[in-house]
Amino acid sequence: MTFRNCVAVDLGASSGRVMLARYERECRSLTLREIHRFNNGLHSQNGYVTWDVDSLESAIRLGLNKVCEEGIRIDSIGIDTWGVDFVLLDQQGQRVGLPVAYRDSRTNGLMPQAQQQLGKRDIYQRSGIQFLPFNTLYQLRALTEQQPELIPHIAHALLMPDYFSYRLTGKMNWEYTNATTTQLVNINSDDWDESLLAWSGANKAWFGRPTHPGNVIGHWICPQGNEIPVVAVASHDTASAVIASPLNGSRAAYLSSGTWSLMGFESQTPFTNDTALAANITNEGGAEGRYRVLKNIMGLWLLQRVLQERQINDLPALIAATQALPACRFIINPNDDRFINPDEMCSEIQAACRETAQPIPGSDAELARCIFDSLALLYADVLHELAQLRGEDFSQLHIVGGGCQNTLLNQLCADACGIRVIAGPVEASTLGNIGIELMTLDELNNVDDFRQVVSTTANLTTFTPNPDSEIAHYVAQIHSTRQTKELCA
């Protein structure tokens, strides 16, 4: 029997993991084993919110070395991370400045400035990317305005996954799916947009032309001396997660649920019309030339911060207590910029409820209930927006990623959206990473072929909508109120 051993390095905003995948060609089975899991998080350094890329690199190398120490022959390695953030290098490949995180406040006020100076519609027509205040476009503008002394030293700007691939191989690459998240790639040419780059203040020479997933960047020399190919996978973690979403037919939507929730659908063509612009829809690059038409939702970041501030260690117990509470007593907009990185998330949630004359969530369970209900309602709104955009309703929603283990939120989502929810796989980004590696090794034909493997090997759970649930009645009441207002307008 023929085996392939592929390693996925999957870095998220709150944790990272090195995973070993074993693929059996004859029976088309795929098994995952966690080799090394480690924490990731924000740090304060010289007045900036930053990432500790040295610690992350050490953890990656530790995980890879563990695989080699077991005597396993690695066939390939792939790295995926979050989007928009970058590392600057000089001509010798040494870092310039700090690896600033997207939650830093340095970009405050720059997005409206860009819209005024370049035109909101023009930016959107060029990039097809949603307006988020921390997009790379605004981060680079902040850098060039606030730290001009760094500019003469910069020779290269590498996005996070490309930086770690460079550290392993010594070769530079600019992978397409992640590059599109910057709001700097022209949606028609798939290359860096010169007008947007000019506004950012960055030099085009800092970047190489984006390359699509599936090429070998270079090789990592393992401790035993073997050269192991490092593959340019779909290096934006959501792009990898979508590859591993077992989407079945054109009426399937996906929700990649983690620190961020990203809801969308696959399309062969982008959506950049007025409706898409008004809804702030993004058209991020995917594998095989597909577009990930989606919308960012703040996601479980709010819960992560509450758990941290309240020092809650038993999440299952919290969810059980939350489930016993009535629904929809405390509703916030999770996508409000006030929740990007407040000093105290609990206080910020309570303030938002107070300002809208709602009861104030005080207990741990009440805060969690507020977050879960608010997310489910926002999921329903976004799914409706996406259906209107493409002119066709969805028949099912695939929730993938770590957040799909939250059965309460899955059921709330099914009830609020009125749609069948299929939860799983949990390690979607890792699996999608592995999928591209296997295609590069000529073990699989394409993304659809890989999804068949996922469908037969992953643990999937179905949640059926309950029209009699509290949140379903709440949604129906909102829709009725909206229709009445429209008739009376």
From Swiss-Prot:
Q: Which residues form a coiled coil?
A: none
Class of the enzyme per the UniProt entry, highest EC level? transferase
Q: Name one GO cellular component term.
A: cytosol
Q: Which Gene Ontology biological process is one annotated for this entry?
A: rhamnose catabolic process
Identify the residues that bind substrate. 83, 236-238, 296
CDD domains from the UniProt entry: ASKHA_NBD_FGGY_RhaB-like (cd07771)
Enumerate the UniProt keywords alphabetically.
ATP-binding, Disulfide bond, Kinase, Magnesium, Nucleotide-binding, Rhamnose metabolism, Transferase
Spell out the catalytic residues. 237 (proton acceptor)
Output the PANTHER family linked to this UniProt entry. Answer: L-RHAMNULOKINASE, SUGAR KINASE
Q: What does this protein do?
A: Involved in the catabolism of L-rhamnose (6-deoxy-L-mannose). Catalyzes the transfer of the gamma-phosphate group from ATP to the 1-hydroxyl group of L-rhamnulose to yield L-rhamnulose 1-phosphate.
User: What protein family is recorded?
Assistant: Belongs to the rhamnulokinase family.
- Record's protein name: Rhamnulokinase
Source organism per UniProt: Shigella flexneri
